[in-house]
């Protein structure tokens, strides 16, 4: 199966409706990851098929959880997941990609330019030191324990906003260690076509 068909089949299996032009741009993003990986150490994956599953389809599981959002912050964005795939598919959402690694933010800037993502801003720095970002949704993928995630980013969350933390196995221990002023709205298991591993998303809000 060629890569375009593999991506299309995965998107269909997830019940998502993504324009053909956006799918082409997602594959262009994979090309950029492959091109710059040796220089910037963006991903341990080298196989394109695995990149499509782990970096595209896995990131796209976020889309139903940012419905209605106008602004999103992707913390510890690294090589741009889930922020860049989300930005490609949701051009109506203003997305900030934040990472403390300057090599990775240099790549993110390049990717934003080459992919023509007018709705994306890249910020380099530690999240605790950032003050000029406010978001309806703050997301991360394998960034930090939930308690640290909400503690470090709470000042950047808009009133009425929420966190959407992408996790592997059900994070019961992390949930138990959350501060009293944060409540768990839901933890949903995610099905990623072609990925033989558990995935969950935790939706959290301030009390």
From Swiss-Prot:
Q: Which GO terms describe its molecular function?
A: rRNA (guanine-N7-)-methyltransferase activity
Q: Which reaction does it catalyse?
A: guanosine(527) in 16S rRNA + S-adenosyl-L-methionine = N(7)-methylguanosine(527) in 16S rRNA + S-adenosyl-L-homocysteine
Q: Which UniProt keywords apply?
A: Cytoplasm, Methyltransferase, rRNA processing, S-adenosyl-L-methionine, Transferase
In terms of Gene3D superfamilies, this protein maps to:
Vaccinia Virus protein VP39
Binding-site residues, S-adenosyl-L-methionine: 76, 81, 127-128, 141
Q: Which InterPro entries match?
A: rRNA_ssu_MeTfrase_G, SAM-dependent_MTases_sf
Q: Where in the cell is it found?
A: Cytoplasm
Gene Ontology terms, cellular component aspect? cytosol
Q: What is its EC number?
A: 2.1.1.170
**What SUPFAM superfamilies does its record include?**
S-adenosyl-L-methionine-dependent methyltransferases
Q: Sorted alphabetically, which HAMAP family does this protein's record hold?
A: 16SrRNA_methyltr_G
Q: Spell out the family assignment given in the record's similarity comment.
A: Belongs to the methyltransferase superfamily. RNA methyltransferase RsmG family.
Biological function: Specifically methylates the N7 position of guanine in position 527 of 16S rRNA.
Which PANTHER family does the UniProt record give?
S-ADENOSYL-L-METHIONINE-DEPENDENT METHYLTRANSFERASES SUPERFAMILY PROTEIN (PTHR31760:SF0)
Q: What is this protein called?
A: Ribosomal RNA small subunit methyltransferase G
Gene name on record? rsmG
């Amino acid at each position: 199966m060629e890569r375009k068909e593999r991506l299309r089949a995965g998107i269909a299996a997830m019940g998502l409706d993504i324009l053909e032009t956006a799918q082409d741009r997602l594959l262009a993003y994979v090309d950029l990851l492959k091109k710059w990986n040796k220089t910037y150490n963006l991903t341990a994956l080298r196989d394109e098929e695995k990149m499509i599953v782990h970096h595209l389809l896995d990131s796209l599981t976020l889309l139903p959880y940012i419905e209605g959002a106008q602004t999103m912050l992707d913390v510890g964005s690294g090589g741009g997941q889930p922020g860049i795939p989300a930005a490609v598919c949701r051009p109506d959402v203003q997305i900030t990609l934040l990472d403390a690694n300057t090599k990775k933010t240099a790549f993110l800037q390049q990717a934003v330019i080459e992919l023509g993502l007018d709705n994306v801003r890249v910020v380099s720095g530690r999240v605790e030191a950032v003050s000029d970002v406010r978001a309806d949704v703050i997301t991360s993928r394998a960034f930090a324990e939930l308690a640290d995630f909400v503690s470090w980013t709470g000042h950047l969350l808009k009133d009425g906003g929420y966190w959407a933390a992408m996790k592997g196995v059900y994070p019961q221990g992390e949930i138990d260690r959350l501060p009293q002023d944060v409540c768990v709205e839901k933890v949903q298991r995610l099905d990623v076509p072609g990925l033989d591993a558990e995935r969950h998303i935790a939706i959290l809000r301030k009390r």
